[in-house]
């Protein structure tokens, strides 16, 4: 039996190389078996790409990453033109191999100690009023990257005192309490952690993660910071039923989560998990009604909704779909 090749620091593994060692194997999709995208998933491209170019140049100038690009988000054009971006800290290489995600897997490099200052200056240069800070999973770090999050929040606020900051954090596997202790020194304005899918699909879609751990992370943060909104997001189209998603919504409310995003899963490549169904806008509307009826203060539900899609409007309680 051949031993797996040792990962080299800083080398990005994608597609087949990324998903080759996960528990539930992904069979590459054949074009004739892939579901055809419905018309409601067509993305309208902007008339001008100048704003997109400006933001990309600002990111490259300071060696920063956006999850918009790294995860191939379908809303990149709209969000960049709107003047918003979700910054991805701690590098662009994840220690997990989730087969729904287009972010590269591998052995990450040491965190850039100057990244918090570079991020703060970039945000100031871009004149942003609301930012989302997320990261890859960093299971290689003792605190899962929590101190780097806190450092980024502190530096951003020093240069941008009026800004609102939302964090979209990983699950801090095995170190939740230590991570929350660190984040308590610089808490965000909105705390977001995505459950992604229903628990019966975790082994297939989120190898290395645990549904209850993720719920506990959200609940424990809320217990420490009762006045800070907590938020979570789910994808549809991975094989779940609407009834399973409804149960997840009830679980989130039982753990005091107040804000919700619900969107359609889109397959990044033939090597990723296939789309098993396209959920209609009417079904998203029904789930939004359910979410609001059980106490979510804000629910953004629609085919192209993502956890950071118009996050500023979500935080203001405005409708996003």
Swiss-Prot record:
Alphabetic keyword roster: 4Fe-4S, Cytoplasm, Iron, Iron-sulfur, Metal-binding, S-adenosyl-L-methionine, Transferase
Cofactor binding notes: Binds 2 [4Fe-4S] clusters per subunit. One cluster is coordinated with 3 cysteines and an exchangeable S-adenosyl-L-methionine.
Residues binding [4Fe-4S] cluster 2: 94, 98, 101
GO molecular function, one term: 4 iron, 4 sulfur cluster binding
CDD domains, sorted: Radical_SAM (cd01335)
Enzyme class, spelled out: transferase
Pathway per the UniProt entry: Protein modification; protein lipoylation via endogenous pathway; protein N(6)-(lipoyl)lysine from octanoyl-[acyl-carrier-protein]: step 2/2
Cofactors named for this entry: [4Fe-4S] cluster
Catalysed reaction, written as an equation: [[Fe-S] cluster scaffold protein carrying a second [4Fe-4S](2+) cluster] + N(6)-octanoyl-L-lysyl-[protein] + 2 oxidized [2Fe-2S]-[ferredoxin] + 2 S-adenosyl-L-methionine + 4 H(+) = [[Fe-S] cluster scaffold protein] + N(6)-[(R)-dihydrolipoyl]-L-lysyl-[protein] + 4 Fe(3+) + 2 hydrogen sulfide + 2 5'-deoxyadenosine + 2 L-methionine + 2 reduced [2Fe-2S]-[ferredoxin]
Major localization class: cytoplasm
EC annotation from Swiss-Prot or TrEMBL: 2.8.1.8
Chain ranges of the Radical SAM core domain: 80-297
GO cellular component terms listed in the entry, alphabetical order: cytoplasm
Compartments in which it is found: Cytoplasm
Binding site for [4Fe-4S] cluster 1: 68, 73, 79, 308
Stored InterPro entries: Aldolase_TIM, Elp3/MiaA/NifB-like_rSAM, LIAS_N, Lipoyl_synth, rSAM
Signal peptide: none
Record-linked Pfam families: LIAS_N, Radical_SAM
NCBIfam families linked to this entry: lipA, PRK05481.1, PRK12928.1
Similarity annotation: Belongs to the radical SAM superfamily. Lipoyl synthase family.
Record-linked HAMAP family: Lipoyl_synth (MF_00206)
Protein's name in the database: Lipoyl synthase
């Amino acid at each position: 039996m051949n031993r797996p090749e040792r990962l080299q620091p800083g080398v990005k593994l994608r597609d087949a190389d990324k998903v080759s060692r996960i528990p539930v194997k992904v069979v590459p999709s054949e074009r004739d078996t892939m579901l055809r995208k419905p018309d409601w998933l067509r993305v309208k491209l902007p008339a001008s790409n100048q704003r997109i170019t400006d933001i990309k140049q600002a990111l490259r100038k300071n060696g920063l990453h956006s999850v918009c690009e790294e995860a191939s988000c379908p809303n990149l054009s709209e969000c960049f033109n709107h003047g918003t971006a979700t910054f991805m800290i701690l590098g662009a290489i994840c220690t997990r191999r989730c087969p729904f995600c287009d972010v590269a897997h591998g052995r990450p490099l040491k965190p850039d100690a100057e990244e918090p200052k570079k991020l703060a200056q970039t945000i100031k240069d871009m004149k942003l009023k609301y930012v989302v800070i997320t990261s890859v999973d960093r299971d290689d770090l003792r605190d899962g990257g929590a101190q780097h999050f806190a450092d980024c929040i502190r530096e951003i606020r020093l240069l941008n005192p009026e800004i609102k900051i939302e964090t979209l954090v990983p699950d801090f596997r095995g170190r939740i309490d230590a991570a929350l202790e660190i984040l308590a020194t610089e808490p965000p304005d909105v705390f977001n952690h995505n459950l992604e899918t229903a628990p019966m699909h975790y082994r297939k879609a989120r190898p290395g993660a645990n549904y209850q751990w993720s719920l506990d992370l959200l609940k424990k943060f809320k217990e420490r910071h009762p006045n800070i909104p907590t938020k979570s997001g789910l994808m549809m189209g991975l094989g779940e039923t609407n009834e399973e998603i409804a149960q997840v919504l009830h679980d989130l409310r039982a753990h005091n989560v107040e804000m919700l995003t619900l969107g359609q899963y889109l397959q990044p490549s033939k090597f990723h998990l296939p789309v098993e169904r396209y959920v209609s806008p009417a079904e998203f509307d029904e789930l939004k009604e359910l979410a609001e009826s059980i106490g979510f203060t804000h629910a953004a539900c629609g085919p192209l909704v993502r956890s950071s899609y118009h996050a500023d409007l979500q935080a203001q309680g405005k409708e996003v779909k």
